[in-house]
């Protein structure tokens, strides 16, 4: 009896620790915690895959909401861009899921891992080319003379991100971040804040769907969320204090590590 209580207590602490890691990842690279939470819940807590995904999305909503607020307080969210990207990415995701059904799952994960590695290397090289004392430039690579041109571009980008996210599954936050950095050349802090806000909305939409089918473990979700809030606050505090060049190095390393892990996991399967 006592042994069971101790074991349950340790498992709950473990869940909170995983939540802290998830919150940290979200605050630094705007990524979903699904790749961390789902394997942990299925292996250590005997939760079904569908319930694990639903619970992970539930935690994503909490974590990304907290992180978004932290970035908002520092003026690092572009609300106008967020609205158009959210609307168009939802439509694109529906098309992406149709493509995904025709592609082997292992190929998708390995390909996404390679994309993350390449993106990480690109960001790392770019960070070393910058002057360490140079301030982040608010200018974007694409200039628009009229508002409708900017809105059209955001819709196209959002639709494209939605397709990619639908194909790769839990990659929306990362793909949005990459698009904002690589295509529109958002300052990194603002790109992370904006992508995290967008992920809050998209994750909430998916969470409602899983909740309606009873595929959320609220007990574990709340424990993970406690950790995610702690990790999100600490990670966002660090991210908003460091300069863009340093943060870019951290983000690039996170991308490469995540990409390597995903690729290796698919190779050894």
What kind of feature is each model-predicted range?
Residues 1-24, 38, 43-44, 70-163, ...:
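Juxtamembrane transmembrane-helix boundary motif
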Residues 25-34, 165-172:
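Short helix-coil transition sites and intra-membrane helix breaks within transmembrane domains
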Residues 54, 82, 192-193, 252:
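Conserved glycine-rich helix-kink/hinge and helix-boundary motifs of the Major Facilitator Superfamily
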Residues 56-60, 195-199, 220-225:
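Short hydrophobic/aromatic, small-residue-rich stretches within specific transmembrane helices
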Residues 58-66, 91-92, 99, 198-205:
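Membrane-embedded alpha-helical segments of transport systems
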Residues 37-51, 165, 175-190:
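Interfacial segments of multi-pass membrane proteins
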Residues 6-11, 58-66, 145-146, 170-179:
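Hydrophobic, membrane-facing alpha-helical anchors
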